[in-house]
Amino acid sequence: MAQVVHIKEQKYDRQLRLWGDHGQEALESAHVCLINATATGTEILKNLVLPGIGLFTIVDGNVVAGEDVGNNFFLQKESIGKNRAQTSMELLQELNDDVTGNFVPESPEQLLDKDPSFFCKFTMVISTQLPESTLLRLAETLWDSNIPLLVCRAYGFVGYMRIIVKEHTVIESHPDNALEDLRLDQPFPELREHLQSYDLDHMERKDHSHTPWIIVVAKYLDKWRSENGGQMPKSYKEKESFRDLIRQGILKNENGVPEDEENFEEAIKNVNTALNITKVSSSVEEILNDDRCTNLTHQSTSFWILARAVKEFMAMEGKGNLPLRGTIPDMIADSDKFIKLQNIYREKAKKDASAVESCVSKLLQSVGRPPESISERDIRLFCRNCAFLRVVRCRSLEEEYGLDTAKKDDIVSLMENPDNEIVLYLMLRAVDRFQKQLGRYPGIYNYQIESDIGKLKSCLNGLLQEYGLSLTVKDEYIQEFCRYGAAEPHTIASFLGGAAAQEAIKIITKQFVIFNNTFIYNAMLQTSATFQL
């Protein structure tokens, strides 16, 4: 067993550094459904199979045609005439022995007619190149069950993605440049006691130059506050004065020249970090005050039960503060001093997590859930990351398309720049209308391009008029979309495959933050944009 674990660690080494063992476990226990084994679809699955998605099912009733072989590297000449789902599944499964693949040789329309609940058994569903009418039916089915749907589409030199999920909660958002949780502005009792054991004025030189910078800042902060009415250095001028105060504490040699004490230089450098005020961010406050946090039920997810437990901790043991994160950065110090300081933060974090665990136990009992339904590991993970919680709520596709609920004002505002990527969204909606009316996409055959330009323009104007949008789209966009002929270039499919797989992994692992809710890629100009539509 240990050997198997070691082999997996070697195989997935790089990704384990990104999302950890628990993230990999979530990935390996996931079951993803792909609708349509197009070039885009197989590229997405490739990027999920390689990192070890547990199980995938391809739904596709089409047989492999010559055009599929032309733009899909996972299909061969010998595949022509065979079911596209089965052929793609067999070839994709060869990429990773740890992954299990299934296929359903039926169209999504057939499954939606026969058994809509079929799609509700998956961790998430990814659709590619679906017509609008089918997409709306699928989205409605999954919305009610809160099953995430990732819509992907490559259309000529345009890439499109839409995430549709009622609510997606993120514990490990991995923010860039996150501030340390040191609590030097309000030291907890264990830290205060440890600080009192240091006397920087009566130390041997070796000890003085190997004292952790956190201790150095804390000791001089006490001195500053005693001389400034208990206030923290706030303005730039005050912080510079505080740095000078620390600088004066550097030992001097017999000639009065300051010694080279790197720990003090480190303290001066980290003043802004150390003086960070302990407070709860507005985004986390919003989560803790959310109705789902306040009004728990038997259906409440573990995220909301944990959030409520943290809120109760803050009202009692936390005295208004979140549980301590329990980590400190690396620094210049001797091992003994650093480890003692590190352990003080760790033990305080464990103590806070234990208090939260008690709250969780009571809350689980109150909503009729078994105590083991939220593990100790989950509680500690939540406490360690509770300063960076995120909740993403997407609008439904029905709301986006509804005449009364569409974000018309936002679209008009964006179209003040006639070349904004939102114009590509409008064109995709127009070609869908074209397909609905004529049963094909514009420009499929070269001889139709010229005549289809006028028809597509009419569809676009009809769409704009229906939504009451007084907008003008440049003719060159209409002409370009007719020239695309609904082609799915592999270069665009490949780009989307990487981007979509990344979002899928975020959804499955509940790590990092997904976009909300629409992504447009303009390959002509190598630009992209996200919109909340």
UniProtKB/Swiss-Prot annotation:
Residues 330-343 are annotated as: Interaction with uba3. GO terms for biological process: protein neddylation. One of its GO terms (cellular component) is cytoplasm. InterPro entries: APP-BP1 (IPR030667), ThiF/MoeB/HesA (IPR045886), ThiF_NAD_FAD-bd (IPR000594), Ubiquitin-activating_enz (IPR035985). Keywords: Ubl conjugation pathway. GO terms for molecular function: NEDD8 activating enzyme activity. It comes from the Eukaryota. Coiled coil: none annotated. The record marks H210 as: Interaction with uba3. Pfam families: ThiF (PF00899). Pathway: Protein modification; protein neddylation. Regulatory subunit of the dimeric uba3-nae1 E1 enzyme. E1 activates nedd8 by first adenylating its C-terminal glycine residue with ATP, thereafter linking this residue to the side chain of the catalytic cysteine, yielding a nedd8-uba3 thioester and free AMP. E1 finally transfers nedd8 to the catalytic cysteine of ube2m. The covalent attachment of nedd8 to target proteins is known as 'neddylation' and the process is involved in the regulation of cell growth, viability and development. Belongs to the ubiquitin-activating E1 family. ULA1 subfamily. Heterodimer of uba3 and nae1. The complex binds nedd8 and ube2m. This is NEDD8-activating enzyme E1 regulatory subunit. The gene is nae1.
